[in-house]
Amino acid sequence: MVIVVKVGINGFGRIGRNFFRAALASNANIEIVAVNDLTDIETLAHLLKYDSILGRLNLPVTHNENSITVGTKTFRVFAEKDPAALPWGSVGADIVIESTGRFTKASDAAKHMVGGAKKVVISAPATDEDVTLVLGVNDSAYDPAKHNIISNASCTTNCLAPMAKVLHENFGIVRGFMTTVHAYTNDQVILDFPHKDLRGMFHEEGIAHFMS
């Protein structure tokens, strides 16, 4: 019997759309049943179809007032600010990918479970999560009986930890120093603009230099 994992995505931006494309390309038994994003549905469909980094999605993408269809698969689109108001149970979502970057505290991410989700995977470092997992490093530590709010760690950690694990297991690491080259994020500006961190107010001379 083939078990299909039904997934909802909260935050259909860079990470959310990348997850969608990865799930589609993997041919895994994953069904995206709904996404939640405050952006209008026409724009979401367009951004999913046309990506300046990954190129065009090689399937037709259409939409109506409350759903997007990719090829023959249709998923609901919600526009809720409060995770607790999302009706994940009504669309059968077992797992929610929390990729807004906003709800990284376990108490906030757990609000998805109010609407019916059984597990939440946060696509960033989190606070008070049940476990932080990096595939290929410590994913064997996952315990489905007690790990419901899961952090997938940071992009830097996912790049560094697998390599460090191999080096440490085979040769040993006493101490280390790393430099990361990071692309601009949604939080960084390319014009002078107010920012909660004063270093981040001034276009490319700002916080990008101090990110890591």
Predicted regions, residues:
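N-terminal Rossmann-like NAD(P) cofactor-binding subdomain of oxidoreductases
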Residues: 2-203
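Short, intrinsically disordered, charge-balanced linker/junction segments flanking boundaries
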Residues: 206-212
